[in-house]
Regions:
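N-terminal type II signal-anchor transmembrane helix
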Residues: 2-67, 132
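Secondary-structure transition motifs
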Residues: 2-16, 69-70, 86, 91-198, ...
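Short structured motifs
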Residues: 58, 72-75, 108, 157-158, ...
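Short extracytoplasmic
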Residues: 62-90
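Generic short beta-strand segments
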Residues: 76, 90-94, 130-132, 173-180, ...
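Short beta-strand micro-motifs enriched in acidic
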Residues: 79-81, 111-117, 135, 197-201, ...
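Beta-propeller and related beta-repeat scaffolds in trafficking/envelope systems
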Residues: 185-206, 210-216, 224-231, 237-239, ...
C-alpha cells in the first residue's frame, strides 16, 4: 500500500504577512524611541550636567535669540541631580537697546529634561523675587521693564511672547508687579507677594495669579484662565486667536477701583462705588470677551445700568449677574437677586432680564425690563 505524501503547511496569506511586517516595524520604532530616550538621558547627565557652567555663553546666545533682547547670566549652579536635573541661574539680566539692564532676575531655577532639551527649552522655569514693571503705552504697545512685548510691526510677532508661551511651565514666586496704563490714564497699580504659574500643555494655556493689592483695594485676590488656541494662528499677537474662560475671585474688593483696570464696558453699566466679595467668570472667543457672569455680595453700591438710565443707590446687593453682547445691543440678567435701596425699594429675592438696544438712525433707543417678585411697598 502506497502512503500519501505528508501535507505541507499552508502558506500565510498576504494579509498575515503584511501584519507581521507592520508589527516588526512598530517594534523597531519602539526600540528606536527608547534608544533615543536612553541616549538623551546619557547625554544630559553625562555631558551637559557636569559641564553646565561651560554652556553659559551658549545659553546666553540662545536666550537672546529666543527673547529678541540681549541676555546676560552671572552664574550657573547645579541644584539637583535627580531624574530631571535643575540648575540655578543667578543674576540674569535682560538688556535694552542701549545695553542697560532693563530687567534683573536675582534667581531663576530651570529644570531640564530630554524632551525640553530637544526643543531648546526648559521643563520648568521658576523665577524668584522678581520685580516686574508692566506698562501699556499710549500707542497700545505692551512693555515689561522697557522690553517690548507687542511687536513693533503688525505683520510681525513678538519673540518674547512666543518664547514665554512655548515653555512647559513658568512659575513666579514672591514677586512684585507694577502695572501702568498710559492708554487709559489710570493710576499705577502695585501688587505684592505675587505668586503666578503659566502652563502650556499642547494647544492649551492655563494661568493663575495670586497677589496682594494696596489696602484701599481690598484683600488678596486670585485670577485664573483656561484658554485654547487654534491649530493655525492668524493674529500677530498670540492671544488674539484664543478662546476659553477667565475667572476672578476677590474676598473683599472696592469695585469702583477695580473697574478702572478692567476692559471698557460697552453696555454702559457704571459702578461708582461698592465694596464686598466678588466672583466672576468671563467667556472669551477669538481674544475678545463676549459675555460673563458674576456672583456678588456688596454694600454701599452706586451704579448706573445704562447711559440713559438714572443712577441706582443700594445699601446692599447680593446675587448673580450676567451679561452678553448681542451685536450693537446688550443683555443683562440676574439670578437670585436681592437688594435694599436708600429710597426704600426692597427686593427680597428675584430675577431680572434687561435688554437694551441703542438708537439706530431714525429708530430710537429701546430698553426692555422683565422682573419677578418686585416689592415696591
Amino acid at each position: 500500500m502506497v502512503s500519501a505524501p505528508p501535507l505541507s503547511p499552508p502558506l500565510p496569506s498576504r494579509r498575515v504577512r503584511l501584519a507581521a511586517r507592520l508589527a516588526r516595524a512598530l517594534l523597531w520604532l519602539v526600540l528606536g524611541f527608547w534608544l533615543l530616550i536612553g541616549l538623551s538621558w546619557g547625554l544630559l547627565h553625562g555631558w551637559i550636567v557636569p559641564r553646565i557652567s561651560d554652556f553659559r555663553p551658549s545659553l546666553e546666545a540662545q536666550a537672546s535669540r529666543a527673547l529678541g533682547v540681549p541676555v546676560r547670566i552671572g552664574e550657573i549652579r547645579v541644584r539637583s541631580l535627580g531624574l530631571i536635573p535643575s540648575f540655578e541661574l543667578r543674576e540674569v539680566s535682560l538688556l535694552d537697546r542701549d545695553g542697560h539692564t532693563a530687567l534683573r532676575l536675582p534667581s531663576v531655577v530651570a529644570a531640564l529634561s530630554p524632551r525640553s532639551a530637544w526643543r531648546l527649552g526648559f521643563e520648568q522655569l521658576v523665577i524668584e523675587g522678581a520685580e516686574l514693571d508692566i506698562r501699556r503705552r499710549a500707542d497700545g504697545q505692551l512693555e515689561i521693564a522697557g522690553l517690548r512685548l507687542s511687536p513693533v510691526d503688525d505683520r510681525e510677532r513678538s519673540a518674547f511672547a512666543d518664547w514665554t508661551l512655548a515653555q512647559t511651565e513658568l512659575v513666579l514666586r514672591g514677586g512684585t508687579l507694577r502695572w501702568t496704563d498710559e492708554l487709559r490714564g489710570t493710576p499705577p497699580l502695585a501688587l505684592t507677594d505675587v505668586q503666578a504659574v503659566l502652563r502650556n500643555p499642547g494647544q492649551r494655556h492655563l494661568m493663575r495669579l495670586d497677589a496682594t493689592p494696596p489696602p484701599a483695594w481690598g484683600e488678596r485676590f486670585s485670577l485664573r484662565a483656561m484658554l485654547k488656541k487654534p491649530l493655525l494662528a492668524t493674529g500677530h499677537l498670540p492671544w488674539q486667536d484664543w478662546s476659553g474662560e477667565l475667572y476672578a475671585e476677590f474676598s473683599r474688593a472696592d469695585v469702583s477701583l477695580l473697574r478702572q483696570y478692567l476692559p471698557t464696558d460697552q453696555s454702559g453699566v457704571v459702578v461708582s462705588s461698592g465694596q464686598g466679595a466678588l466672583r466672576a467668570w468671563a467667556d472669551v472667543r477669538n481674544g475678545a470677551v463676549t459675555g460673563g457672569t458674576a456672583d456678588v455680595l456688596l454694600q454701599g453700591v452706586n451704579t448706573r445700568l445704562g447711559q440713559d438710565l438714572p443712577p441706582l443707590v443700594l445699601k446692599t446687593v447680593a446675587g448673580r449677574f450676567g451679561g452678553r453682547q448681542l451685536g450693537s445691543a446688550y443683555e443683562l440678567r440676574t439670578e437670585g437677586l436681592s437688594f435694599a435701596a436708600d429710597d426704600g425699594l426692597d427686593w427680597p429675592v428675584g430675577n431680572v432680564l434687561l435688554l437694551h438696544t441703542p438708537a439706530d438712525g431714525n429708530k430710537p433707543a429701546q430698553t426692555e425690563l422683565t422682573a419677578d417678585r418686585l416689592d415696591l411697598g
